[in-house]
Structure formats: C-alpha cells, structure tokens
C-alpha cells in the first residue's frame, strides 16, 4: 500500500484567483522517507496540509483532484481518522500546545483514543523518555524554551503511534545537539518502517536520513530525485535559492555525481569571509537573574562593538532569550529575581528606564513573533510600528516593504503568510522604528537559505549604516557568512567570544557545530568531529 497517492491536485485558498499548488502526480511508498524542500512560500506547507487533512477539514480551501493516504480519500475522511495514521509536528510548535504542563500535553492526544489507562501511561512515559523530557514532566508549557516545547509536541505525536509522520521543519528551533537527537529518532523511525515526510531547509543535515528529495518551486514540483543524485543537481538546486554547500558545487564542477568526502578532504580548501572589527562600545550589559529558589539563570556580562554584527549561540535553555529579555526590559520580575540589570547603550544608562523609553534605543524581535501582529495587512502592521516610533512617511514605508521582499504582500493579512514571510514582516516592523541597537532572537529560524542570505545582506547594510546587531541563532553557516563576532553561551554565562573562525575551533565542547566546510577545508582537524 502506498502512503500517499496524488493525482491532478490543485489547491486554491479562499479569495485567491489561482492555485497555491498544482501537482499532476506524486506517490510516496509506505516506509519511504521523503524530504520536501523549497523556498519560503513555495507551497511546501500547503502540500503537507493536504496530506494530513488539515486542508480541507481545518483550512477552507478548494481541492481539485485526488489525494489518498494509506488508501483513504482525504477529502471524504474525517481528520480525526486521518490523524490515527498520520502524525504531524507543525512548523511553529507554540500553536500546537493546548495544555498547562508537559505531561498533560503528551497525554492529550492519547486520551482521545479511549485506550486503557495502563497503555496510555506506558505510551506517555516512553515518549517522554525518548525525547529527554521526563525530568520536565511537571513544567508549565509557557516556561519552556523553543527546543523544549518542540520535544514536548514530538513526544505527544509519537505517543499516538502513527504509521506516518510529517515533520514540518523539526530542527528549526533547536540547537545542534537537539538536531542530532531528532535525526537519530528519524533514523529509528525509518528502521521501524514508519513513513516520513520531512519539510526542511537544511538539506545537508537531513540528507543521510531520507530516500528522496522533492523540491517545490512556485507551487509546482520542480525536482523529484533520489538522494544520491543531489550533487548532479547541485547547480540547479542552488539556482533555486536552496542551501547547497560550497563543497557540493565544488564536486559538481569536478565531475562528481555523488558526495565523496575522501576526495574533498584531499583537495577542497575553504577560507572564511573577511570581517570588520568595530570601534567603540555600542552596548554593555551586566546581568544577574535567578529563580525564586536562588538558582542563577544568567550571571554574565556582554559587550557589543559599534557597527558590528554579533551572533549569540548556545544550547537550548542556556539563557540566550532570557538575556535578551533583560536587556530590552521584558523580563517577568514576578517570576524571576533580577539581581543586576545594568544596560548602557551608546553611552546612555538605561538600567532604570521603563520599557517604552528603552525601546527608543533598542529594537527587539522575539523568537515567537506572531504575537506582535495586531493589524489586518502587512502594510498597516509596519505603518503602525513606524507611527508609534514617530518615523512614518510613505516613502520610507515603501523602502521597508521592498527591502524585505514584502511589496507583493502589502495588502495580505500577516497571519495567512508562510512562517518565513511572517518573520520578514515582523523584522520589517521592528527595524522600521529607528533604534540603533537591534536584538534578534532566532530570525533565521524557518527561513530558507535564499531569504537567510537576503537577511544577512540586509544586516550587513544596516551594519554599514552604523547599526549594531545581536543575532541569536543556531545557524553556524549564517554566522560564518555574516557575523563579525561570535559569542557562545552556556549555563547562563558567555564562555567563548571572538571572531567566528576563532570560536568555532573550540565550540564543539559547548554543543556548537561549525559548518562542515571547516573540517573538509582543513580549518579543523578530523578528531574535533569525533
């Protein structure tokens, strides 16, 4: 039996004139693992939403053609029946959590299956153990980091024992260690015969764990190949804006059709890009934050040089987001004790200022940015932000829309856009305000390589105009390409700092993986990757 059978599919959202995706034929065999990739907004999420029944049962859209999952007609089968066979991890795990604590969330789906209490407990305990969250069982959902929340939702899905899993960017919000753990689980799922669809931008990372690669471009399947053919298609995939590493292009140029690591280690060289040093101190912060029980979550100092891009990396739960929230004045002082909060921006002491005043000096983009949207159109959202900060004019609005490739979406509701597009709306809104120091929490999460490069180039332009930027990210290739400095945080402290190539040499001990080019190009010896 096939996992997926699609024939003559067209999906058109309400209010749209043309289909968002058109697929003449697509088959996925039972037990097969498939990577679906493509640029943000290309139609990937629409395709998987048809496979799991979200379209048309939860999202109102017109479907033409035939879609079958394990033999069931998706259009006529209730979604609760489809969910018994197909489990899904959504792109933004925050939208998938409904309960107060972790154990309640993991048990929620299984409870609806009306199985015995003993079996339910067994499934819940097994799932929490597999995902490493057993010790967090009584934690409140709203206190979890992005990675912890993602593991919780995955555990909830796994507890329902589906025949197939759809993982919509499962590594987008987690650190390298978490990525390795999830991919090891993918390996386990494959060995157990579970059918898998992974929607991912990180082609390089998931390649060993899939059988096929499907590329969606402008609502159509542009490429459908076995994974062994990826080097042969490297140039074309790169032209589509996908994250094809430099060493794959090097192999293609030298006549290879498959990846040959032995050849690469003998012949491939890599040199990091040039960086600037910066002059003067744009931001200094000394922060100490502890729980009501006296456990320090943050105990560190941070300094950003004027007119530079600094990346902040670290494991999930290391304190990166908490540090940013203290600096911008968003920390919950009823839940946590702020022992020290010294913040100086461009010589101005903001330590005792309120949130509104601090916001004139520091712009902040949170990790889960959908909560920022309060207007019905992209244009009005950015306009509202600019007016609040006294920076609005029509010409500037147009420039911001074009800068973030949003001009074509100016009349769209931000909440109906893809995650990558929504993130660009949030970034445009924050950066349109005029603050000279910008803190961004995971702006690369969920973005394809094409738009990450656009983001990086925009940050370089802002840097060259005198802006100082701090970017929290797990994306080491983005850091290597665009950051001037790299800070590594562990257990609430900055433990490494310097230029990325200096820090990457020492970063593995703190769970930070350099781009593979560093090892293949001889910048880091093989034993560092053991």
Curated annotation (Swiss-Prot):
Supply the EC number(s): 7.-.-.-
Q: Tell me where on the tree of life, at the top rank, the source sits.
A: Archaea
Chief subcellular location: membrane
Binding sites annotated in the UniProt record for ATP 2:
314-321
Sorted alphabetically, the Gene Ontology BP terms of this entry are:
transmembrane transport
Q: Which Gene3D superfamilies does this one have?
A: P-loop containing nucleotide triphosphate hydrolases (3.40.50.300)
Q: Where does ATP 1 bind?
A: 38-45
Q: Which GO terms describe its cellular component?
A: plasma membrane
Give the protein's biological function. Answer: Probably part of an ABC transporter complex. Responsible for energy coupling to the transport system.
> How is this protein named in the record?
Putative ABC transporter ATP-binding protein SSO2030
What organism does this protein naturally occur in? Answer: Saccharolobus solfataricus (strain ATCC 35092 / DSM 1617 / JCM 11322 / P2) (Sulfolobus solfataricus)
